[in-house]
Swiss-Prot record:
The gene is HBA. This is Hemoglobin subunit alpha. The modification Phosphotyrosine is found at Y25. Red blood cells. The lineage of its organism: Eukaryota, Metazoa, Chordata, Craniata, Vertebrata. Residues 2-142 form the Globin domain. The modification N6-succinyllysine is found at K8, K12, K17, K41. One of its GO terms (cellular component) is hemoglobin complex. Involved in oxygen transport from the lung to the various peripheral tissues. The modification Phosphothreonine is found at T109, T135, T138. GO terms for biological process: hydrogen peroxide catabolic process. InterPro entries: Globin, Globin-like_sf, Globin/Proto, Hemoglobin_a-typ, Hemoglobin_oxygen_transport, Hemoglobin_pi.
Length: 142
């Protein structure tokens, strides 16, 4: 998936608006994923999956940090996410569809919190960005 210059600008702009809430929003998106798609819980049998648990918050921060790195290095997603791709493909063996499910729930969460800043153009660009991140994260599965 090729991100246009406009897409990259929208992603960087909205990530700037997310700011210090990135970990909180990512944790909410993760929790939303667990509720909307219960099969995703199978990868977290050791987690306390209750609302706002410390483990969900901590994993949300990891997700947010990885996305922040991806935004910062938007022109080199494969290089930026290579180690994370290895981890998910070879050690964790996460079903690739779960990245799409999480991406969807992250979009819903961002839309709920960002209001008018989450324009249709931003939505489309962020969707393309998350799809590109998902593609990179699943690239080592082949």
């Amino acid at each position: 998936m090729v991100l246009s210059a406009a897409d990259k600008g929208h992603v960087k702009g909205i990530w700037g608006k997310v700011g210090g809430h990135a970990g909180e929003y990512a944790a909410e998106g993760l929790e939303r994923t667990f509720h909307s798609f219960p099969t995703t819980k199978t990868y977290f049998p050791h987690f306390d999956l209750s609302h706002g648990s410390a483990q969900i918050q901590a994993h949300g921060k990891k997700i947010a940090d990885a996305l922040g790195q991806a935004v910062e290095h938007i022109d080199d997603l494969p290089g930026t996410l290579s180690k994370l791709s290895d981890l998910h493909a070879h050690k964790l063996r996460v079903d690739p569809v779960n990245f799409k499910l999480l991406s969807h729930c992250l979009l819903v969460t961002f839309a709920a919190h960002l209001g008018d800043a989450f324009t249709p153009e931003v939505h489309a660009s962020l969707d393309k960005f998350l799809a590109a991140v998902s593609t990179v994260l699943t690239s080592k599965y082949r």
